[in-house]
Amino acid sequence: MRKLVEATQAGSEASVALAPSAPIQRLQAGLHHDPFEVLGVHVQPDGSKLVRAFLPAAEAVEVAGVRMTRVPGTDCFERLLPPGTALEAHPLLTWQDKRSGAWQRLRSPYSFAPQLGEMDLYLFGEGRHFEIWKVLGARVKTVDGVTGCLFAVWAPAVLRVSVVGDFNDWDGRRHPMRCRGVSGVWELFIPGLEAGHAYKYEILGRHGERVTKTDPYARQMFLRPETTSRVPDERPYAWGDAEWLAARTRFDWQHRPMSVYEVHPGSWRRRADGSFYSWRELTAELIPYVRDLGYTHIELLPVAEHPFDASWGYQVSGYYAATARFGSPDDLRAFVDACHQAGLGVLLDWVPGHFPKDDFALARFTGEPLYEHADPRRGEHQDWGTLVFDFGRNEVRNFLVANALYWLEEFHIDGLRVDAVASMLYLDYSRRHGEWLPNQHGGRENLEAIHFLHEVNAEVHARFPGAITIAEESTAWPAVSRPIELGGLGFSMKWNMGWMNDTLDYIEKEPVYRKYQHNQLTFSQMYAWSENFVLPLSHDEVVHLKKSLLDKMPGDRWQRFANLRLLYAWQYAHPGKKLLFMGGEFGQWNEWREAGQLDWVLLGFPEHDGIRALLRDLNRLYRDEAALHFWDFDPRGFRWIDCHDADQSVLSLVREGPDGAPPIVVLLNFTPVPRHGYRIGVPRAGAWCEVLNSDSMYYGGSNLGNGKPLYPAAVPWMGFGQSIEVTLPPLGAIFLKPCP
């Protein structure tokens, strides 16, 4: 305590006018590490109370009805109150604004005790606080009967952290925070602050660099181009999906139908003026549309906050903030709620592998690497121009694991599709020799990322029974979708990129050349049971000059539509869950453009509406027939009838269900030549009926098929004791089932 240089005046109060001490000078300069040492109420040995406040915008300040004195040359005001002076635990200060002259009232943040619990800080330091979003970030709460906002942020090894915002003129000297020791966490409770305020953190790094950052744990942010965090509304959302959540705990996803409609919410449909649909508008239009098509799930491209529309959400700046583009967090909750009440699950694309270099967000958060690995050979994706999380740092891993749980807990999301898993697993991913560092064993496997993925999957499955995790993993890494205890990564499912690439490469060829590439269709059965596969026709296949699915197809106009119908029939005949990106359901000609909307006008053309009708019926058949979904991940559900007819480019197969379920026989003709009297063996005697024909007139086809029951002859064929002769439509597929 510095020495008083002005004696106590007459009366019951004391005024102090002092030359600024070193602590006050550091406070004035924004360099003080511990503002609680200087500000607030300090009881003296004789029982007097020294009250200090730092108010750069104030002309005058009063406490307990007594004028405080400005410390010369500073914006610090103080008053020494004699022993026995009645003073609230959190005294109310009255101050006069320099600019307006108006008098205002506030309570000093520096009279409040620390708010974060030691156990919270310990668990966070251990990387095991899986509800950390309830601790860090901004939260409106009441402390000692005073309502305000508690801010908390992790920023280790820095000189100062301050809350700046629209409530303090973005002045980093106004609200410096309290450091919670070795945890590296800083906190401050600001009385009177309500939801809706804009804020950031100003950080003074250990080398003197000053950066201003959005809150990594912000649960709400302002619409781009703004980059500020927003104090969130704490009022709870009234969910109406309890029945869905209860049923989800019993959801047997391995044996249930699962067809996913992948959606970019910013470009599915737009208003007449080109602006985004809100979640409320999407609720009214998207949900009934998807339900009518028969899909079981909607998968949303990333909806966490991101600064750049053209990143599609894959370069995230606010991992805990639902993007402001489509409304409030509660609007997103209402969308998910409505999906559940309509019988639709909701999956979310999640991006834990990398983050952008934008200087307002996570990159060099303390003026130097914090969330990213410090060595660019591990900390940077050169191809994407992004940074890689330091998965080996407890607090960073905790940030990400808790974020996965956050979306499932706070938004009732039913599962996560994890983006770019391969880039996380390999230290040399897309790196040349000398541009990467091996692990401690000299290998290229990222052991820290593997541990992180284990932890994410284990916690998701333990805390949210029935929720699923899906890996976008493009290599042959083994056991991605196998349990951790069996040596796997613990994902529920994995995208089958091999099936997708081979199938599209095959079907883009002119039919006359397909017989030479027949193995591209059959090869997937060599590994089909090694993972729990999803068959994706995703957004990645209809961008960057790859063309839309319809525009990839060879031939004249009729053949292009027929080929696309055949592609979808092959997807639903093949074992594995299904995924299709929006626009594919009606055969959009253009590539996907995130800056516009789908070409809805095409539904006025019969061929396009026929594609949609086919997918509606494929989803119905897939859902209703256990043979087409029950053994999606088990070889008991699939058998080739004939996979060797390369000369005619025909495949025939049978899908089997559980005991008692009728089998489904599928034939696919990948040439424009009709096949009459085409004989195949069948697994059962008795009549067979055609239950779906991709060449039906209802789908825009030529209507060639098998309108009458097909009766087997006692002619052994292809390992079966009986066989039938069928008519195969050109570039068409037929699904047969034992007649009732």
Curated annotation (Swiss-Prot):
Keywords, ordered alphabetically: Carbohydrate metabolism, Glycogen biosynthesis, Glycogen metabolism, Glycosyltransferase, Transferase
The keyword Transferase is assigned to this record: yes
GO MF, any single term: cation binding
EC number(s) on file: 2.4.1.18
Catalytic reaction(s) noted: Transfers a segment of a (1->4)-alpha-D-glucan chain to a primary hydroxy group in a similar glucan chain
Source organism superkingdom: Bacteria
Biological or metabolic pathway of the protein: Glycan biosynthesis; glycogen biosynthesis
Alphabetical list of Pfam families matching this protein: Alpha-amylase (PF00128), Alpha-amylase_C (PF02806), CBM_48 (PF02922), GlgB_N (PF22019)
Active-site residues from the entry: 419, 472
Transcription regulation among keywords: no
Cellular component GO terms held in the UniProt record: cytosol
Enzyme type, top EC level: transferase
Gene3D superfamilies: Glycosidases, Golgi alpha-mannosidase II, Immunoglobulins
Annotated InterPro entries: A-amylase/branching_C (IPR006048), Branching_enzy (IPR037439), GlgB (IPR006407), GlgB_N (IPR054169), GlgB_N_E_set_prok (IPR044143), Glyco_hydro_13_cat_dom (IPR006047), Glyco_hydro_13_N (IPR004193), Glyco_hydro_b (IPR013780)
GO BP: any one term: glycogen biosynthetic process
Stored SMART domains: Aamy
Family: Belongs to the glycosyl hydrolase 13 family. GlgB subfamily.
Function text: Catalyzes the formation of the alpha-1,6-glucosidic linkages in glycogen by scission of a 1,4-alpha-linked oligosaccharide from growing alpha-1,4-glucan chains and the subsequent attachment of the oligosaccharide to the alpha-1,6 position.
Summary of subunit composition and partner proteins: Monomer.
HAMAP family (UniProt xref): GlgB (MF_00685)
Protein name from the UniProt record: 1,4-alpha-glucan branching enzyme GlgB
